[in-house]
């Protein structure tokens, strides 16, 4: 109300007006009264109370708008704080390996417009799909659900490296249900998003690792898939084990021992390049990696089997 009081004091027709503020006497009729009176082309209303009330209402309306703005800004701050709190909870559950609890938390906010929340939901959906106890029917639904969340995250923020990364991952997963032709057709799109993720965040070891997987996959592509690729593209996607190895090593340099699968793939790539000594080194690291997730356990098993396999051949 302070603003209203100030406006009231500035009104020209208030009681106790300063000397000289009244209109000159005798401009229209006797005794110095104005009928309404005309003064140099302006008509001044003869009821000052009406004018006061109108101006006061305008002041109050302005104050109401200012209050609305303050409340709106406070709501935005509160909503932002709430999202930050949810993200902290989500990251804690992810680091703790609480896959299903994380999914349950984030699905409550599946209608969110926040890219950071949406890509985490895409990741959580995919992680639940990969659990051994998830049925094939549920897995398929979760894979497509994950792609939708990742797509929305990317639409909300194209500058989010994680949104590019998870969109590419989820698009690749969907290819498992749509056939080899669709998977190859999406190959360049997937590669572009991995490259964009690396460009936006060169220190993200996971994006670099995934680019290595892309190279490894196309390096070992069987002949019949290469034929399909030639039908789809004038220049079909291709790569080499050397390129894959470069990405896996680069990921390891950025964040040593960040992921058991990177260690496994370093070993497998060296096997493809017939370097058994270095293959054994990396496979041993994969086998001894502390198992925090179900995937880690699967990788430990595969690494142990590969070590046994080529040790027996020697």
Swiss-Prot record:
<dbReference type="GO" id="GO:0007052">
    <property type="term" value="P:mitotic spindle organization"/>
</dbReference>
<keyword id="KW-0677">Repeat</keyword>
<dbReference type="GO" id="GO:0005739">
    <property type="term" value="C:mitochondrion"/>
</dbReference>
<keyword id="KW-0206">Cytoskeleton</keyword>
<dbReference type="GO" id="GO:0005737">
    <property type="term" value="C:cytoplasm"/>
</dbReference>
<dbReference type="GO" id="GO:0008017">
    <property type="term" value="F:microtubule binding"/>
</dbReference>
<comment type="similarity">
    <text>Belongs to the RMDN family.</text>
</comment>
<keyword id="KW-0493">Microtubule</keyword>
<dbReference type="Pfam" id="PF21033">
    <property type="entry name" value="RMD1-3"/>
</dbReference>
<feature type="repeat" description="TPR 2">
    <location>
        <begin position="222"/>
        <end position="258"/>
    </location>
</feature>
<keyword id="KW-0802">TPR repeat</keyword>
<dbReference type="GO" id="GO:0051315">
    <property type="term" value="P:attachment of mitotic spindle microtubules to kinetochore"/>
</dbReference>
<dbReference type="InterPro" id="IPR011990">
    <property type="entry name" value="TPR-like_helical_dom_sf"/>
</dbReference>
<keyword id="KW-0963">Cytoplasm</keyword>
<feature type="repeat" description="TPR 1">
    <location>
        <begin position="168"/>
        <end position="204"/>
    </location>
</feature>
<dbReference type="GO" id="GO:0005876">
    <property type="term" value="C:spindle microtubule"/>
</dbReference>
<dbReference type="GO" id="GO:0097431">
    <property type="term" value="C:mitotic spindle pole"/>
</dbReference>
<protein>
    <recommendedName>
        <fullName>Regulator of microtubule dynamics protein 1</fullName>
    </recommendedName>
</protein>
<dbReference type="InterPro" id="IPR049039">
    <property type="entry name" value="RMD1-3_a_helical_rpt"/>
</dbReference>
<comment type="subunit">
    <text>Interacts with microtubules.</text>
</comment>
<feature type="modified residue" description="N6-succinyllysine">
    <location>
        <position position="165"/>
    </location>
</feature>
């Amino acid at each position: 109300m302070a603003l209203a009081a100030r406006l009231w004091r500035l009104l020209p027709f208030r009681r106790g007006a300063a000397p000289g503020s009244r209109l000159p006497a005798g401009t229209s009729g006797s005794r110095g009264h104005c009928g309404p009176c005309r003064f140099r082309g302006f008509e001044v209303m003869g009821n000052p109370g009406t004018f006061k009330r109108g101006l006061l209402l305008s002041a109050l309306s302005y104050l109401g708008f200012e209050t609305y703005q303050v409340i709106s800004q406070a709501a935005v701050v509160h909503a932002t704080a709430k999202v930050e709190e949810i993200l902290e909870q989500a990251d804690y559950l992810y680091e703790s390996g609480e896959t299903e609890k994380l999914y349950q938390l984030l699905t409550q906010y599946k209608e969110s417009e926040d890219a950071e929340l949406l890509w985490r939901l895409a990741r959580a959906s995919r992680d639940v799909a990969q659990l051994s106890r998830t049925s094939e029917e549920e897995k398929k639904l979760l894979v497509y659900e994950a792609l939708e969340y990742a797509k929305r995250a990317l639409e909300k923020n194209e500058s989010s490296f994680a949104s590019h990364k998870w969109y590419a991952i989820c698009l690749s997963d969907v290819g498992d249900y749509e056939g080899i032709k669709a998977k190859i057709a999406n190959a360049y799109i997937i590669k572009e998003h991995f490259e964009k993720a690396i460009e936006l965040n060169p220190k993200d070891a996971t994006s670099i690792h995934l680019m290595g997987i892309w190279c490894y996959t196309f390096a070992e592509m069987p002949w019949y898939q290469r034929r399909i690729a030639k039908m789809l593209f004038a220049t079909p996607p291709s790569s080499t084990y050397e390129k894959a190895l470069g990405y896996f090593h680069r990921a390891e340099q950025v964040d040593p021992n960040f992921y058991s699968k990177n260690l496994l793939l370093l070993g497998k790539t060296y096997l493809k390049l017939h370097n058994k000594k270095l293959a054994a080194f990396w496979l041993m690291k994969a086998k001894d990696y502390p198992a925090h997730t179900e995937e880690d356990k699967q990788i430990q098993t595969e690494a142990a089997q590969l070590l046994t396999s080529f040790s027996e051949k020697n």
